[in-house]
Amino acid sequence: MLTHIFDLLIRQMTKHKHRSTSFLLFILSALLLFVSTVARAQTVNLDRVLPELEPEIQRTLLAGNIPSASVALIAGDKVIWTNAYGYSNLWARTPATPNTVYLIGSTFKAMSTIALLQQMELGKFKLDDRVNDYLTDFKIQGEDPQHPVTFRHLLTHTSGLPADFGAFPVWGDTVPPSLDDYLRKSLKVTKPPLTSVTYSNMAFTLVAYLVQKFSGVPYKQYIQEHIFTPLEMTSTAFEPRPDMEERLSIPYVVDEKTGSQMGTVRVKASVWPAGIVYGTVLNQANWLIANLNGGSFKDKRIISEATLNQMLTRQYDQFKGTIEGIWGNETAGFGLTWWTQVRDGDRYLAHSGSVAGYTAFLLGNRDRKLGFAILTNGNRAHPHLFKLADKAIDLMKKYSSAEKLSTAK
């Protein structure tokens, strides 16, 4: 991108020879200052960060009964460091690596939201439109026409649709129903929209159906073409490919009687678009980079900056505060799927994921473009990962030349 800017400037200087040389030199100097500032904002001194961060990672694994974790740090538009700890398979003593595959859970939800908002940018719907107006094969049941469920409600967990999950062992005979069949039988609100925040996997199964309906492309194919491929998420999939199976971690839960870690079954679910997705921390880092850089990854844009800013803005002030009591401070709340908050004057985005022996977390500082991604095969380890993520970002801020790139609002 910078090469393109310099080439353009040289062409303009050649084309307009009559213009003041001093003026053109002024423009060039300003551009160089801009480049220097951006580069400085993305520099993190890992020699200072890692001696403090790595012991914290080890303590987190111990405190959270987490067999293994793969971790990545992001600054600007790059992964600046990655490492892995513990064993992805305790019985085989298989060391985890940055290429170990885990289930990423609900961290996938924001990817599905991007897919839906891509359709919004094509003019297919507006955020505050009634969803039922776009459903032809079935409807959201129990809806009060005076208080209709909108697209914004779906993306903020305020629709009144229930949580739902419906898990089955991955090697069992039970096959999850198609999106159409599941939604036709299950899509019913339990309360009016905006009554409260109720984390809803069913809502995001409907989001997947809507992406498919608007685009005319099967949902899994659409996600592959419009999210995974442009972001070079080559080891992320709804079902692990053979090469991913070779790197797949075993999910573990803690035996309540003995305190020991036990392998548990991987699951499939009726609401699989809500987070039954597998990936690596390196792929998660690419996703986080796109969200910290205005919707672009290596000059490939997946969403406009204006739409992404909507995603990263808290939507309903009445629901500010902790996200279901587990993350954030008094400013925290849902954007369009992403969790958002302001801490120490900086704006943050975050999301976790947890399914049957796996816990994942993503945290990004929007104003300094710093990010932390972690995938684990520990069960319900959220509080430990949240503390570790905050520590990692704080250390990167402390040991960097990262000047604030924008002002929190």
Spans of model-derived segments:
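Sec/Tat signal peptide C-region and signal peptidase I cleavage site
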Residues: 37-41
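Well-ordered alpha-helical segments within folded domains of soluble proteins
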Residues: 112-113, 203-208, 285-286
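N-terminal secretory signal peptides that target proteins for export/translocation
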Residues: 1-20
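A short, well-structured edge-of-sheet supersecondary motif
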Residues: 62-95, 127, 169-176, 234, ...
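Bacterial N-terminal signal peptides
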Residues: 25-36
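Active-site-proximal loop and beta-strand segments within enzyme catalytic domains
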Residues: 63, 90-201, 217, 242-266
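Short, solvent-exposed loop/turn and secondary-structure capping segments
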Residues: 82-85, 164-170, 224, 238-241, ...
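Catalytic loop of the DD-peptidase/beta-lactamase superfamily, centered on the K-T-G motif
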Residues: 42-83, 212-225, 229, 262-409
